[in-house]
UniProtKB/Swiss-Prot annotation:
Name of the protein: 4-hydroxy-3-methylbut-2-en-1-yl diphosphate synthase (flavodoxin)
Lineage, broadest ranks: Bacteria, Pseudomonadati, Aquificota, Aquificia, Aquificales
Effect on the protein of changing residue 103 to D: Reduces activity 200-fold
Result, substituting residue 55 to K: Loss of activity
Binding site for [4Fe-4S] cluster: 265, 268, 300, 307
Gene Ontology MF terms in the entry: 4 iron, 4 sulfur cluster binding; 4-hydroxy-3-methylbut-2-en-1-yl diphosphate synthase activity (ferredoxin); 4-hydroxy-3-methylbut-2-enyl-diphosphate synthase activity (flavodoxin); iron ion binding
Cofactor entry: [4Fe-4S] cluster
Annotated family: Belongs to the IspG family.
Entry keyword annotation includes Plastid: no
Quaternary state and interactors: Homodimer.
InterPro entries: Dihydropteroate_synth-like_sf, Enolase-like_C_sf, IspG_bac, IspG_bac-typ, NO2/SO3_Rdtase_4Fe4S_sf
């Protein structure tokens, strides 16, 4: 069992982060924030997918102006993403955001960062210190020669110490780079020296399978080491995919369970059914199920039930038929044309019982 790193607990709106709270899944909208309707529609989709905190970009004044309505109508806490324009941090807090994300390296003078922190303290707004390889302080680049893991960690520790000195503790830190091992090492260095909650992810991971794999490896390593209080899978894709991927990573490590986890055999010469087609149909029809269930779809009856005995329910497919099984025991033989519908009926019954029977 994974032993999670002990961190202090903070709050972003009504969401607890760190301490004994579960790891929180975040994402970021890809809409123009000033397009309130599009932004709220995407926030709704993210929320329905399981997102618990959402970040929005505020590069322009019109984006800041849109925040009040977005915050008011959002079903989850909203974080304003601030870069290069410290005035937008103050304005965003006036509009009621629950948190702000700043990169001190591109904000400017230390006095300005402190003023932002003092305002956040006054308003009860959480702050995320964002450190990444693309905007490291000049003196650290000169010291290390490049954005090394040590340089990134030192930057994060430097600003963390300043926040503590200023009497502000409702903050978390993110240390991100596009290199997986550098990212892991930087977070490990920071985690060994402080109890500040960490937001983890791999920046600029890319799109499709490559982006998902890169993020899964980087995030998975840190989570296995007990590091990470909030997580975002950064992909060049629909942000809903980020949320879905984050939950798959957490489910794989036994850290969160939400919705259906489908397991299926890799196929071999024994299968008598178009298994990829069946799995895809099952995935699509179960996408709206919120009850944590493990569903197995196996391509033959030889070892299927034994191999999938840890599943809550599943199908072991044969030629023209399938065995429907629950908790490792066959309960019904069904025709191939009816097997998916029979599986769905049984899952609906399990949902009514809370997934236990």
């Amino acid at each position: 069992m994974i032993q999670k790193r002990k961190t202090r607990q903070i709050r972003v709106g009504n969401v607890k982060i760190g301490g004994d709270a579960p790891i929180v899944v975040q994402s970021m909208t890809s809409t123009k924030t000033h397009d309130v309707e599009a932004t709220l529609n995407q926030i709704k989709r993210l929320y329905e997918a399981g997102c618990e905190i959402v970040r929005v970009a505020v590069p322009h004044k019109e984006d800041v102006e849109a925040l009040e309505e977005i915050v008011k109508k959002s079903p989850m806490p909203v974080i304003a993403d601030i870069h290069f324009a410290p005035s937008y941090a103050f304005l965003s807090m006036e509009k009621g955001v629950h948190g702000i994300r700043i990169n001190p390296g591109n904000i400017g003078k230390e006095e300005i960062v402190r003023e932002i922190v003092e305002e956040a303290k006054r308003r009860g707004v959480a702050v995320r210190i964002g450190v990444n390889s693309g905007s490291l302080e000049k003196d650290l680049l000169e010291k290390y020669g490049y954005p090394s893991a040590e340089a990134l960690a030192e930057s994060a520790l430097r600003w963390s110490e300043k926040f503590e000195k200023w009497g502000f503790t409702n903050y978390k830190v993110s240390i991100k780079g596009s290199d997986v091992l550098q990212n892991v090492r930087a977070n490990l260095i920071f985690a060994e020296r402080t109890d500040v909650p960490l937001h983890i992810g791999i920046t600029e991971a890319g799109m499709g399978t490559k982006g998902i794999i890169k993020s899964s490896v980087g995030i998975g390593i840190l989570l296995y080491m007990g590091i990470g209080d909030t997580v975002r899978v950064s992909l060049t894709d629909d942000p809903v995919v980020e949320v879905e991927t984050a939950y798959e990573i957490l489910k794989s490590l036994g850290l969160r369970r939400r919705g259906v986890e489908i397991v299926a055999c890799p196929t071999c010469g024994r299968i008598e059914v178009d298994l990829p087609k069946v799995v895809k149909e099952v995935q699509e029809k179960l996408s709206g199920v919120k009850t944590p269930l493990k569903v197995a779809v196996m391509g033959c009856v030889v070892n299927a039930i034994g191999e999938a005995r840890e599943a809550d329910i599943g199908l072991a497919c044969g030629r023209g038929f399938a065995w429907l099984f629950k908790h490792g025991k066959p309960i019904k033989k069904v025709d191939e044309s009816e097997m998916v519908d029979e599986l769905l009926k049984e899952i609906q019954n399990m949902e009514k019982d809370g997934g236990t029977n």
